[in-house]
């Protein structure tokens, strides 16, 4: 189950079920006749935090929302659980999740007792979160332990807004050059070239023959479907069943804001959309070339 909330900057917040589990984080049996003190060091928050940004990469699927390799951020995690017949709830904010805070505790363990520290761990798309919460239990040595039980575990994650084919307006940005695909007039045809303006919009369509790229900024009415010319230039033509107007994307549906894709032409099957410094334009479809392009949802 999942629910979503549309946010600014091309992202949406989605609530999803995640896996959480109580584990034995630390245990000590004091078989002596006097109390002992033990120092416990723990890390609360994200496990193996190694990114300068909050963007993570899914290493396994998460319902219908995340696929392996998809980028996402964790906004919060909430878990309800039962311990000693009492129901409780605990949550972590984004700041707490990403902090990876190292904490030291000193505990006193009575004689002939066992100390057990239960830790609540969560997994969100392959990212481990340690010590969401902890419960300390002191029992007689050999006595049965009261293991906490997870009732429900949910996370709010930030993912790129879904690109709905035939509907969502997008920008197409060259991943390496960080310039946008724009449309200019060349030889009395609308033609694709890179530029700094982010005002040029496109819509992706799909039919039985492949993906189609429609410009919303043609200067020649009706000439709006991207195709590869025989010389490799990218122009916009009237709609037809010409396979030169069809493209294969490197990423499976659904597409989302921020996805990085390549475009391979369905007529020139060994050629892909790329940057090349031409005489008047610099977006081409060339053999054995498939540059990476970033899809950005236009906020409406």
UniProtKB/Swiss-Prot annotation:
Site (Crucial for binding sphingomyelin and inducing hemolysis): 22, 247, 293
Annotated region (Beta-hairpin domain), positions in chain: 36-109
Gene3D superfamilies according to UniProt: 2.60.120.980, 2.80.10.50
Region described as C-terminal receptor-binding domain: spans on this chain: 159-299
Subcellular location: Secreted; Target cell membrane
Residue positions binding an N-(acyl)-sphingosylphosphocholine: 187, 229, 235, 284
Disulfide bonds: 274-285
Ranges where the record places region N-terminal cap domain: 12-35, 110-158
Tissue: Expressed by coelomocytes.
Any one GO MF annotation of this record: toxin activity
Coiled coil: none
Transmembrane residue ranges: none
SUPFAM superfamilies from the UniProt entry: Aerolisin/ETX pore-forming domain
Residue(s) at site: Crucial for binding sphingomyelin and important for inducing hemolysis: 189
Cellular component terms (Gene Ontology): extracellular region; membrane; other organism cell membrane
Any single biological process term in GO: monoatomic ion transport
Keyword Metal-binding attached: no
Keywords: Antibiotic, Antimicrobial, Cytolysis, Disulfide bond, Hemolysis, Ion transport, Membrane, Secreted, Target cell membrane, Target membrane, Toxin, Transmembrane, Transport
Family that this chain belongs to: Belongs to the lysenin family.
Function: Pore-forming toxin that specifically binds sphingomyelin in the plasma membrane of various cells. Has hemolytic activity. Binding and hemolytic activities of this toxin are 10 times less than those of lysenin and lysenin-related protein 2.
Assembly mode: Binds to sphingomyelin as a monomer by using its C-terminal domain. Forms a nonamer when sphingomyelin/LRP-1 ratio is lower than ca 500. Oligomerization, but not binding, is influenced by the fluidity of sphingomyelin.
Protein name (record): Lysenin-related protein 1
Biological classification of the source: Eukaryota, Metazoa, Spiralia, Lophotrochozoa, Annelida
């Amino acid at each position: 189950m999942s629910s979503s909330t549309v946010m600014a900057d091309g992202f949406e917040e989605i609530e999803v079920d995640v896996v959480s589990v109580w584990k034995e984080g630390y245990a000590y049996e004091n078989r002596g006749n006097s109390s002992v003190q033990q120092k416990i060091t723990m890390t609360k928050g994200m496990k193996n935090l190694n990114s300068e940004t909050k963007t993570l990469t899914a290493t396994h699927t998460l319902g219908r929302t995340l696929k392996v390799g998809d980028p996402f951020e964790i906004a919060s995690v909430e878990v309800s659980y039962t311990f000693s017949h009492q129901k409780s709830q605990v949550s972590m904010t984004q700041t707490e999740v990403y902090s990876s805070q190292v904490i030291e505790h000193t505990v006193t363990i009575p004689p002939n007792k066992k100390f057990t520290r239960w830790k609540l761990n969560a997994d969100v798309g392959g990212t481990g979160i340690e010590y969401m919460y902890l419960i300390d239990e002191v029992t007689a040595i050999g006595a049965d332990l009261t293991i906490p039980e997870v009732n429900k575990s949910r996370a709010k994650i930030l993912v790129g807004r879904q690109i709905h084919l035939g509907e969502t307006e997008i920008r197409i940005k060259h991943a390496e050059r960080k310039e946008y695909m724009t449309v200019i007039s060349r030889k009395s045809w609308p033609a694709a070239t890179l530029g700094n303006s982010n005002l040029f919009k496109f819509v992706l369509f799909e039919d039985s023959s492949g993906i189609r790229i429609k410009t919303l900024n043609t200067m020649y009415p009706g000439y709006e479907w991207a195709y590869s010319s025989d010389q490799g230039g990218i122009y916009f033509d009237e709609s037809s069943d010409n396979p030169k107007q069809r493209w294969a994307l490197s990423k499976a549906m659904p597409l989302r804001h921020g996805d990085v894709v390549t475009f391979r032409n369905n007529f020139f099957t060994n050629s892909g959309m790329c940057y090349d410094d031409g005489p008047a334009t610099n977006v081409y479809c060339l053999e054995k070339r498939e540059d990476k392009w970033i899809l950005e949802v236009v906020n409406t």
